[in-house]
Amino acid sequence: MADRALNLDDFLSRFQLLRPQPSRHALNQRQAAVLVPIVRRPQPGLLLTQRSPLLRKHAGQVAFPGGAVDNTDATLIAAALREAQEEVAIPPEAVEVIGVLPPVDSVTGFQVTPVVGIIPPDLHYHASQDEVSAVFEMPLAEALRLGRYHPLDIHRRGNDHRVWLSWYQHYFVWGMTAGIIRELALQIGARP
């Protein structure tokens, strides 16, 4: 995949041909969802945020827009779209949802469902000052290059975990966010 440019049609056909495997039984019962926004361009981008340094949890970390499901959300997809609107002003109607990835258990006790959606290139992002300190775009082909992610094995709360680490410009991409991007790369058939 690194040998040639990845265009949006290639990404969409590969994503739709390779459906996520059914997920294992969830360790966590509290539900959350994140939007994995792919920017519609000839060479698509992946939209990411950097969380505010003032937040109690995951302060300053690179993340996808998203959060906990609340009682106004009819579905996990609705939760991801609501959170994306609250955090970076992406209107729900501007997102073309193309699917979901297998849920991921977070260290904070949530089962997080990544919702993959295509967004227009001309959206004007407006970061919520309470939650987001930066919004940036990474070329999708670069984000999906498996060789950019490095494993770190840790022992936490009595369990062994593997987390993935990477840099993009001055942003440190790691943990769940790097794991979701890596899962997306594997989903479309990227090879290490």
Curated annotation (Swiss-Prot):
Q: What Enzyme Commission number does this protein have?
A: 3.6.1.-
Any one biological process term the GO annotation gives: nucleoside diphosphate metabolic process
Q: Which cofactor does it need?
A: Mn(2+); Mg(2+)
The chain's coiled-coil residues are none
Keyword annotations for this protein, in alphabetical order, are: Hydrolase, Magnesium, Manganese, Metal-binding
Give residues annotated as binding Mg(2+). Answer: E83, E87
Q: What class of enzyme is it?
A: hydrolase
Any Pfam family hit:
NUDIX
Which residue ranges does the UniProt annotation give for the motif Nudix box?
A: 67-89
Q: Where is the Nudix hydrolase domain?
A: 29-160
Mind listing the GO molecular function terms for this protein?
coenzyme A diphosphatase activity; magnesium ion binding; manganese ion binding
Cross-referenced InterPro entries: CoAse (IPR045121), NUDIX_hydrolase-like_dom_sf (IPR015797), NUDIX_hydrolase_dom (IPR000086), NUDIX_hydrolase_NudL_CS (IPR000059), Nudix_NudL (IPR023735)
Q: Name the source's superkingdom.
A: Bacteria
Q: What is the recorded function of this protein according to its Swiss-Prot or TrEMBL entry?
A: Probably mediates the hydrolysis of some nucleoside diphosphate derivatives.
Give the family per the record.
Belongs to the Nudix hydrolase family. PCD1 subfamily.
The protein's name: Uncharacterized Nudix hydrolase NudL
